[in-house]
Amino acid sequence: MGPFKSSVFILILHLLEGALSDSLIQLNNNGYEGIVIAIDPNVPEDETLIQQIKDMVTQASPYLFEATGKRFYFKNVAILIPETWKTKADYVRPKLETYKNADVLVAESTPSGGDEPYTEHIGKCGDQGERIHLTPHFLAGKQLKEYGPQGRAFVHEWAHLRWGVFDEYNNDEKFYLSNGRIQAVRCSVGITGKIEVNKCQGGSCYTKRCTFNKATGLYEKGCEFIPHSQQTEKASIMFAQHVDSVVEFCTEQNHNKEAPNMQNTKCNLRSTWEVIRDSEDFKKTTPTTTQPPNPTFSLLQIGQRIVCLVLDKSGSMATGNRLNRLNQAGQLFLLQIIELRSWVGMVTFDSAAHVQSELIQINSGSDRDTLTKRLPTAASGGTSICSGLRLAFTVIKKKYPTDGSEIVLLTDGEDNTISGCFNEVKQSGAIIHTVALGPSAARELEELSKMTGGLQTYASDQVQNNGLIDAFGALSSGNGVVSERSIQLESKGSTLQNSQWMNGTVIVDSTVGKDTLFLVTWTTQPPQILLWDPSGQKQDGFVVDKNTKMAFLQIPGIAKVGTWKYSLQASSQTLTLTVTSRASSATLPPITVTSKMNKDTGKFPSPMIVYANIRQGASPILRASVTALIESENGKTVTLELLDNGAGADAAKDDGVYSRYFTTYDTNGRYSVKVRALGGVNAVRRRAIPQQSGVMYIPGWIENDEIQWNPPRPEIEDDVQRKQVCFSRTSSGGSFVASGVPNAPIPDLFPPCQITDLKAEIHGHSLINLTWTAPGDDYDHGTAHKYIIRISTSILDLRDKFNESLQVNTTALIPKEANSEEVFLFKPENITFENGTDLFIAIQAVDKVDLKSEISNIARVSLFIPPQTPPETPSPDETSAPCPNISINSTIPGIHILKIMWKWIGELQLSIG
């Protein structure tokens, strides 16, 4: 198979597989249903906010409808209201809607982040985003001058979220050279406006025409392009949706392919409409001739958490210590994970189902102890999963409707009748979290999680990997305030021989420490357990349960901040250590790690991507050491270092999202994912997320031919807080299912990953310096075999006819290991490279079996040689009005006459006579 066919094959596989998304959105007869807009629990109660959300969506719907050629509109929206707000008659309990699967989050503005609407987008072009972020101030219309009408801004963000398009402006590079002329970064180029700069000194500001930087040929820093208020151009929404005439997305006919913006960089110069047209939404709809109705809204208020454990006690649970491991994990969940004031019930099943506990509200430690005593202790019989689910629904209905309740379903066995209760599950409104234990658990299990928005996890029989405890530890509430959720600090295991020691440390940072629990498990005999706090004081008092083979220590109050040390000693058995805690304060956001795969199914040879999002509130944590442990059904564990370098699988550098490709499949079936994150000497906190996908801040507008300026956009410059952040966390990334994996030896079908951060600079007037992050032999792993670099004076020829473009001599360029920085200096040959020339450059990496990567992002250099004589004044629309010659004669005692002549904008001639 040739490299081009291989790339197409991988692309097709990617399109066939559904991306992993928590969203409940469905497209039905051109209308989007199931949109969830959640109001953050920390937002003060304000009923007008609900009406403002309704107004925004209602205004956005017809704008979206017209912008997409009468194809899409907003049909119904659920607004999720915090539990702490007063209850009202028209507020109902949610079903599957949670904060976890919310498409839009309304949260208070941050001191550094401001009120800028933005969308989390960790994937590639065309991949759906994570969620839209809005603030109450924005919704209240207090940012109209800065971001434009709320409805239009929402459509801009919706395009990021739903179709994976990017912005067509550039806050860092607002102008570029094209054929020797300065152009504003915009789409389309038909948008006209003024180019001026607003200078402020002391308490006063004034507007002046922009001056040129004679070294670059571009405008000075601070220069802004302000669109005229009266326009005829209709595109583009991803550039300036606030302009009245803009009602469309850029198409291939009017798209500005040369503009250095994220849409061109990420989407291979394609217009936003081309990306939208390739979406599944577009493919399964046709334009409608009827005007859509206004959106409808449902008001949902979060209530108390209701959970029923549905636990397998069939005969197979007696093998491999599974039933005892279930007891250990179940005790952790009941003693530590489940939050106060929650309701918990318990059902077990074999060939039939049995109630172990009706719903009990967790108000004290004794309530927790009561439930732990109901965990199953004997295993026998067959496996009837539907019996367990039906009985769980009955248990819940005795006190509450099943809407919004949660079921934790654990099983290790096969059950070919499980699909018989799928309809009952769908109609219940309950969320089902599944835990598949061992290699024989029912293959239909994941369907229950998918159809209800629950978490799917897998635990192998490899006890030292602590998978079952990790699965139950991941079941903290998806709703409520983050300060009440359990946070896992450590999860570790080891098989010890001959009185060996398992030594280690756990960091308790200042953001956690409440309800801290150390849990130790073993497989045969109680080990020696030694634990010291950061001051060196030995901690005694572990509660030992020899029957369940576990011991735990609850630290009273707030655990001391610092490094806790432990030593565990045993012979011929496997030990595990788990440490959990909660936020130390309701007002100090804890550091959290959220991990996931990009898909819940993987088909060889399509790669998977593992993500870990590390935050303290809205602030990303940078430079942490992050590793993913991915375990297959064979028991083989692969360790991946996750990176936040903006290369390979990672979409953006220094945004707190760490990513890596996974390609080392070894078998078909389930894989579990666990992420470990450590913050030490290098880890730091960033005040805000660098904007990737958001509405453009409007620098000003034109009124009566004069620019009215907004305050300068709040800059996030040098915002990394230098104080190091020390912490330790572990996080379950759930599980995924692989198929199509051939028997060993597994063939090499993985090419190098695409280079996405190619940059080019001119050195002198003839040399070009390239920098990029090295790809690997298999995506972002290993070392590529060679690079192919090609250049062209036509950006489209380079994209569409790469193999026909002029090749650069790279004989001396030896690829480095993946994720290293590459630097290459060359002189363009056999091509005209003179003043005013625009040169475009792209790279392709090749591996040892001649598989080729996708062509890189296209870098651009424009050769500008400063003129010896003043250039002509550019046109007013594209730059500014001509500046008249000014001559000032001044005679001052003791000083010669000073003459100033402005020869051309940007050149100041001084002569002293």
Swiss-Prot record:
Site-annotated residues for Cleavage: G694, V695
SMART domains for the chain: VWA (SM00327)
Post-translational modification: Glycosylated. The translation product is autoproteolytically cleaved by the metalloprotease domain in the endoplasmic reticulum into a N-terminal and a C-terminal products that remain physically associated with each other. The cleavage is necessary for calcium-activated chloride channel (CaCC) activation activity.
Broad class of the protein's primary localization: secreted
InterPro entries in the cross-refs: CLCA_chordata, CLCA_N, CLCR, VWF_A, vWFA_dom_sf
Domain VWFA: 306-475
Active site: E157
Signal peptide start and end residues: 1-21
A Pfam family reported for this protein in Swiss-Prot or TrEMBL: CLCA
Glycosylation sites: N503, N769, N803, N809, N830, N835, N885, N889
Protein's GO biological process: calcium ion transport; proteolysis
Domain remarks in the Swiss-Prot or TrEMBL record: The metalloprotease region is responsible for autoproteolytic processing. It can also cross-cleave other CLCA substrates.
Function according to Swiss-Prot or TrEMBL: May be involved in mediating calcium-activated chloride conductance. May play critical roles in goblet cell metaplasia, mucus hypersecretion, cystic fibrosis and AHR. May be involved in the regulation of mucus production and/or secretion by goblet cells. Involved in the regulation of tissue inflammation in the innate immune response. May play a role as a tumor suppressor. Induces MUC5AC.
Protein name from the UniProt record: Calcium-activated chloride channel regulator 1
Organism: Macaca mulatta
